[in-house]
A protein has these predicted regions:
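C-terminal and inter-domain tail/linker signature
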Residues: 1-148
């Protein structure tokens, strides 16, 4: 099994991560194909209809930025095989902003770790599986938090 990364895919995902960490939700439109399919979005974001779901992805990131104004997002690991990239990531911040998934700001630091499996085609993400590993960090317990 070859675990060598396609430099272009890794560059694209690295730029996406940096832009999202900076609050640039337009990165969703530049990185994800219009027919991007998330195996997570419809389940955790009621109202996300089939079709272009990039607006739902951008809204999720905007709500995370509003809840965690000091948000930092980093990619810990990227593994590439054929057209798939596996990413392990960490989102850190302090919940001092807006409510997040209905949870009022706690003022506490939060660290959310997750894993994403992304299918790449033509320099765009076309399919996604995965999400956060847990949601206890902000008191959500068993709440539906499997967002992309």
């Amino acid at each position: 099994m070859t675990l060598l990364a396609d430099p272009n895919d890794l560059r694209i995902l690295g730029a996406y991560s940096a832009r999202m960490a900076a609050g640039d939700t337009d990165a969703v439109y530049d990185t994800f194909a219009p027919d991007f399919k998330s195996h997570v979005t419809a389940r955790v974001r009621p109202g996300a209809e089939p079709g272009d779901i990039r607006p739902h992805e951008a809204t999720w990131w905007a709500s995370a930025r509003a809840a965690f104004p000091d948000m930092k997002f980093r990619v810990n690991l990227l593994v590439h095989k054929d057209d798939l990239v596996v990413s392990n990531w960490t989102l850190q911040g302090t919940h001092t902003g807006a409510p997040f998934f209905g949870v009022a700001p706690s003022g506490r630091p939060v660290e959310i770790n997750g894993t994403a499996i992304l299918r790449m085609r033509g320099g765009k993400v076309v399919e996604h599986w995965g999400g956060p590993h847990c949601s206890e960090g902000i008191g959500l317990g068993g709440a539906r938090f499997d967002a992309a």
